[in-house]
Amino acid sequence: SSLPDGGAKTAFLFEPGNSPSRARMLRAVKSKLPQANFYTHDPLDLGIHVRAATKAFGKPKPVRPRFHFDKAKVILSLDCDFIGSEDDAHRHIRDFTKGRKLNGGNPEMSRLYVVEALMTQTGANADHRLRSKLSDVYGFAGAIAGRVGVDGFSDGGISDVKWVEKCVEDLKKAGKGALVVAGHRQPMAVHVLAHAMNQTLGSLGETIELLPADDLGVPVAGSLAELKSAIGGVDTLVMLGGNPVYDAPSDLGWSEVQGKVKTVVRLAYREDESAEGCHLHLPKAHYLESW
């Protein structure tokens, strides 16, 4: 029923990913339904890293930062559990471990500074850990950025000046071997500050590089929140995986939003909370069926 209008009242909701096969299929769908809109949903908003890097460096197309912890001499983590809950943690563990081993080719260990609210795996491995409220991380980031040389930032009433000064001293000493990272729970402003420090220290192209963001195959109109705002103009919703009724923020009230759509089609592994409000549920092949 959506074909005559080019899919103007059709929306697709899917999980972020880097599958070239899926990207190819989505492009094929877009060619058949040029007016359809595509949205993504991930209960953990790891996309902040892409959005922040793209904004901080003024790139015309989305880019994602790749961190080289094996090359870093001094690391500052701003509420970033990079060897625990962050994206690419498996690679970060391997690279970070290389920098912590003392051998003939690496006579010095890397040094890790961590500002965080809750104890994390990364914090447990820190040489210098500062416990802070989540809301205060930006203040510490600004104080460090100002001392490193980023314009327009000062102390902002921080409590532990000595800790900050020692961190800044080591970051400046490391220069291009320094690396500042921000976690996915932190707002855009903290991520932009982290990238500003990396650029000021000369780390860009050394301990951090910018790569093209994962190709989703089609332009993305937004996240679940944007889809909620546009739901009045949607007659057909196609859900490719995910379980937003279960894991979306409660203030979105996604179960009620989904119930407003005339036709909901879902491809997923099992009949779960989101399946209850669907008109058609299609079984998704798991990895043993699709390899």
Language-model regions: role of each:
Residues 1-291:
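Cofactor-pocket helix-loop regions in the catalytic cores of large enzyme subunits
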